[in-house]
Amino acid sequence: MRALLLLLLVSLATLLCAQETPAGEGSALSFSRSVNVPLNGVQLYDKALDAWNWTFGREPGAKLLQSKREDGTLDGFARFNFRSAMLTMREESMGTVQYKVVIRIVPGECRVLVTELVHSGNASTSLGGVHIGPISRGKDPLSRTPGLSRSNAQRLLAELQERSIQRVEALLNGFEARLRASAEP
C-alpha cells in the first residue's frame, strides 16, 4: 500500500512540474552580422561610419547616439514604417518599428547587432493604437494586445516578423556591401 501511495505521489509530482519554454520561443527578435575586412581599427571605423550613413542612417528617424573612434563603437537607432496587409485594425496597427543598432569595431572585424525591435501603432485613431510592443521570435506576442483577438495578434506579429526580417537583412546586406566596397584599394 505504501509503495502504491509513493508511486502515486511521485507521478503526481512529475505531472505538476513546470514545463520549460522551447529555446527561442519567447526571446526577442535580433540580428547579428560579422564582417571581416583587412583594415586596422581606425580605417575600419571610418568605413563603418560611412556604411552607417549609407544604410541605417537613411532610415526615418535614424540617429547616432554614440560614436567613439578610439573605442571602435557606434550606437544608434532607427525605425521603419509599417502598414499591415491585414484588414482587421489596419489603421490602428499602422505605425513604426523602432530598433537599436550596435556596431563594434576591432582591427580586421566589424560586428553589427540589431536588437530591441519594438512596434508602435497609430495612437491618433479613434480607437487608439494597437501596439504589439517588442517583436519576439515566437508565435505569440510577449504581452496581451488590447483590441485584438489572439489569432489576429498572432497574424499581426507574424507579419511584423516577416517585414522586420526583410528590412533588417536588406540593411545588413547593404552595410556589408558598402563596407567591403569602400575597403577595396
Residue ranges, per PLM feature:
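Ser/Thr-rich, low-complexity intrinsically disordered terminal regions
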Residues: 19-185
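Positively charged n-region of N-terminal signal peptides that target proteins for export
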Residues: 1-4
